[in-house]
């Protein structure tokens, strides 16, 4: 029994780590064209319909961009065209402060990753598609490399997970 106790104590953290509650149920990015994100370019995310119906989720928007992005913010529309009635929300993302220091994570010369909560949404059986469109005055945004969404069970968003 004395041999078993130290072994059990050493193994306990591994057992507990396996019990972590991962609340993320969907997390995907779409790559933006290297020529830029055109206003007409809709980034679409098809949700597996059997998993997400009639639940409330925290929606999070993720962006990856370079220093070539010319603005400190980004306006986007979050569209759920199959929702009844169709839903469209506008979101303002502040990517840099007034002095030009980028928010989010990244190194100083290549790629930055930014996450922002976009509110709670309840998905119905018809909600199988979420779309992102930029609403900036410029018809083509250079420097945005990827945009994505994350759906998590409400009350437990972990923006550090699954980078």
Residue ranges and their predicted role:
Residues 91-122:
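An anionic, turn-rich surface loop/hairpin at beta-sheet edges
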Residues 15-18:
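C-terminal motif of bacterial Sec signal peptides marking the signal peptidase cleavage site
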Residues 62-65, 131-138:
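Short beta-strand-plus-loop segments that form exposed binding edges in beta-rich domains
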Residues 1-8:
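Bacterial N-terminal signal peptides that target proteins for export
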Residues 77-81, 137-163:
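Exposed low-complexity, polar/acidic, P/S/T/G-rich flexible segments that act as propeptides
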Residues 39-71:
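Post-signal-peptide N-terminal segment of Sec-exported extracytoplasmic proteins
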Residues 20-23:
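Bacterial signal peptide processing site
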């Amino acid at each position: 029994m004395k041999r078993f106790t130290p072994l059990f104590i050493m193994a306990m953290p591994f057992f507990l780590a396996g019990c972590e509650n991962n609340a993320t149920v969907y997390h995907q990015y779409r790559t933006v064209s290297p020529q830029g994100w055109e206003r007409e370019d809709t980034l679409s995310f098809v949700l597996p319909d059997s998993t997400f119906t009639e639940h409330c989720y925290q929606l999070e928007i993720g962006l990856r961009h370079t220093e070539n992005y010319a603005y400190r913010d980004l306006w986007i529309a979050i569209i759920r065209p199959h929702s009844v009635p169709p839903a469209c929300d506008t979101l303002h993302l502040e990517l840099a402060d007034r002095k030009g220091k980028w928010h989010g994570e990244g190194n100083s010369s290549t790629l930055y990753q930014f996450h922002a909560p976009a509110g709670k949404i309840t998905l119905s059986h018809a909600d199988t598609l979420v779309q992102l469109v930029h609403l900036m005055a410029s018809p083509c945004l250079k420097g945005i490399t990827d945009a994505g969404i994350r759906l998590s069970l409400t009350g437990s968003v972990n923006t550090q997970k699954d980078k």
